[in-house]
Amino acid sequence: MKRNRWIYAVFTILIIGLGLGSRAFSSVLPDTLNTYLGDSLWAAMIFTGCGFLFRKLKTMITGIISLSFCFVIEFSQLYHAEWIDQIRDTSLGGLVLGYGFLWSDIEAYTIGIAACAAIELLVLGIKKRRCM
């Protein structure tokens, strides 16, 4: 499989915008959606970013790499040395590294990456049928 880097770059930027929007409009979104939306979008951005970087990898491998990255970041939130907490206190550091470990984040990452992988596999299936 060869992914189109332009498409994955556009999706990555679009997902970043949606993620920032989900934070800006969190006061009007339902609590259930707020629990998962931002982190699911963050994981989706990681998936599309990995798709951009590793354009020849199979969907499942891209998903595993993306999910592993998300899990490493989440579990790193259990570590609270002064230097890393200073990074987390910045806007960008907080967005990338997060603040505290939550099991709901693990669920959200899994949902976001599974959704992206499912969409990618669906699109690939449609493309294959058109070529037949």
UniProtKB/Swiss-Prot annotation:
Pfam families registered for this protein in UniProt: DUF2809 (PF10990)
Compartments (UniProt record): Cell membrane
Gene Ontology, cellular component aspect: plasma membrane
Topological category with respect to the lipid bilayer: Multi-pass membrane protein
Residue ranges of the TM segments: 6-26, 34-54, 59-79, 106-126
Domain of life: Bacteria
The entry's keywords: Cell membrane, Membrane, Transmembrane, Transmembrane helix
Protein name: Uncharacterized membrane protein YjgA
